[in-house]
């Protein structure tokens, strides 16, 4: 069976996963916010809000991982892991919903109503990149949520 201990809180693997979540979520926010007209579409605003929450949650846990690695403290107790499970599942579900809704709007724009062809000033490429980055952030977040759930089940 695959070992989840390497990815638990307070380890280098856990820190790497959190840094990846922050990086992809932050990049998604930056790319989406740099596209003119994103604020006219609710799904894109929701994506930015969701990725902002994902960034804050993951940054906080990354800082906690750095602290635990610095002082060599074990974060493997039931109360902390329970908190991580709840936070990870909430942010993973919100990230997935935001990524899917923004992705759906992009499919509508590009393939169904051909907005991207009719309005070349609309930065569809940036919007698509932001959605792809959000999905990558969600993938790491969902992985973290599953690992935390497995760790909680082991108590």
Swiss-Prot record:
InterPro entries: CASP_dom (IPR006702), CASPL-5 (IPR045009). Residues 1-18, 65-77, 150-155 are cytoplasmic. One of its GO terms (cellular component) is plasma membrane. It comes from the Eukaryota. Glycans are attached at residue 40. Residues 40-43, 99-128 are extracellular. Keywords: Cell membrane, Glycoprotein, Membrane, Transmembrane, Transmembrane helix. The keyword Membrane applies. The chain crosses the membrane at residues 19-39, 44-64, 78-98, 129-149. It is a multi-pass membrane protein. It is found in: Cell membrane. Pfam families: CASP_dom. Belongs to the Casparian strip membrane proteins (CASP) family. Homodimer and heterodimers. This is CASP-like protein 5B2. It comes from Oryza sativa subsp. japonica. The lineage of its organism: Eukaryota, Viridiplantae, Streptophyta, Embryophyta, Tracheophyta.
């Amino acid at each position: 069976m695959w070992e989840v201990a390497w990815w638990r809180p307070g380890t280098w693997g856990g820190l790497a996963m959190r840094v990846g979540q922050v990086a992809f979520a932050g990049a998604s926010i930056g790319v989406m916010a740099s596209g003119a007209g994103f604020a006219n579409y609710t799904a894109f605003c929701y994506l930015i809000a969701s990725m902002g929450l994902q960034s804050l949650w993951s940054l906080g846990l990354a800082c906690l991982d750095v602290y635990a690695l610095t002082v060599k403290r074990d974060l493997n107790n039931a109360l902390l892991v329970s908190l991580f499970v709840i936070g990870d599942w909430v942010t993973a579900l919100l990230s997935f919903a935001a990524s899917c809704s923004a992705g759906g709007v992009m499919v509508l724009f590009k393939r169904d109503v051909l907005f991207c062809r009719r309005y070349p000033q609309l930065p569809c490429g940036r919007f698509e990149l932001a959605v792809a980055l959000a999905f990558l952030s969600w993938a790491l977040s969902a992985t973290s949520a599953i690992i935390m759930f497995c760790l909680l089940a082991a108590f």
